[in-house]
Amino acid sequence: MKRTYQPKKQRRNRTHGFLKRSKTPGGRNVLKSRRAKGRKRLTTRAPKK
């Protein structure tokens, strides 16, 4: 049986990335709260190659 989670960097970033978060009011709240908390990473990102 195939497992449910088949990770893909591109899909992860498109779904949970900065641009997607910036588009919706709720996503902007997420960014705002993570900035206020002082998070080093606001959203997911592809590691540098």
Swiss-Prot record:
Region annotation Disordered: where it falls in the sequence: 1-49
Compositional bias (Basic residues): 1-23, 31-49
Family affiliation: Belongs to the bacterial ribosomal protein bL34 family.
Disulfide bridge map: none
Protein name: Large ribosomal subunit protein bL34
Gene3D superfamilies to which the protein is assigned, alphabetical: 1.10.287.3980
Stored InterPro entries: Ribosomal_bL34 (IPR000271), Ribosomal_bL34_CS (IPR020939)
GO CC annotation terms, alphabetical: ribonucleoprotein complex; ribosome
One GO-annotated biological process of the protein: translation
Keyword Manganese in record: no
Organism taxonomic ancestry: Bacteria, Pseudomonadati, Myxococcota, Myxococcia, Myxococcales
UniProt organism field: Anaeromyxobacter dehalogenans (strain 2CP-C)
Entry superkingdom: Bacteria
Gene Ontology MF annotations: structural constituent of ribosome
HAMAP family noted in UniProt: Ribosomal_bL34 (MF_00391)
Keywords from the named record: Ribonucleoprotein, Ribosomal protein
